[in-house]
């Protein structure tokens, strides 16, 4: 049995912050899974790229190779709330029975503790 978590993120031209956020999230998840192998976390990322022009989507794809990532393209007018709604809707469309939804700002650094 796994704990299924859909992580919802919106970004706009914050490539470094977004990739750092994801790197910390993956590291914390991996550390948790090592310590709790009987109940690991299955993580999926639903990220709205709201019209980024700084290469955020490519950087995210690069850091997320082999991960369950869904990038939704916004038109630049979603802002945070609209982008989160788009990502949430995409998570719902996946037909996965998520245990939790994690709404995460792209400048959040998840701790290993």
Predicted regions and their residues:
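A conserved hydrophobic helix/loop-capping motif in glycosyltransferases and polysaccharide synthases
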Residues: 5-17, 21, 28, 48
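Short, acidic, metal-binding catalytic loop of nucleotide-sugar glycosyltransferases
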Residues: 24-41
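A conserved acidic beta->alpha catalytic loop
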Residues: 48-58
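Active-site acidic Asp-centered loop
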Residues: 50, 74, 104-106
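Acidic donor-binding/catalytic loop of UDP-sugar-dependent glycosyltransferases
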Residues: 55, 82, 107-113
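Glycine-rich, basic loop-to-helix element that forms the pyrophosphate-binding segment
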Residues: 74-93
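Short beta-strand-to-loop acidic/aromatic patch adjacent to the donor-nucleotide binding site
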Residues: 97-109
């Amino acid at each position: 049995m796994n704990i299924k978590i859909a992580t919802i993120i919106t970004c706009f031209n914050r490539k470094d912050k977004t990739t750092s956020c994801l790197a910390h999230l993956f590291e914390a998840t991996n550390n948790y899974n090592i310590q709790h192998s009987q109940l690991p976390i299955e993580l999926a990322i639903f990220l709205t790229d709201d019209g980024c022009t700084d290469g955020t989507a490519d950087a995210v794809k690069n850091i997320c190779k082999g991960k369950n990532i869904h990038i939704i393209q916004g038109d630049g007018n979603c802002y945070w709330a609209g982008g989160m709604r788009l990502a949430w809707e995409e998570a719902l469309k996946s037909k996965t029975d998520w245990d939790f939804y994690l709404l995460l700002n792209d400048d959040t650094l998840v701790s290993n503790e």
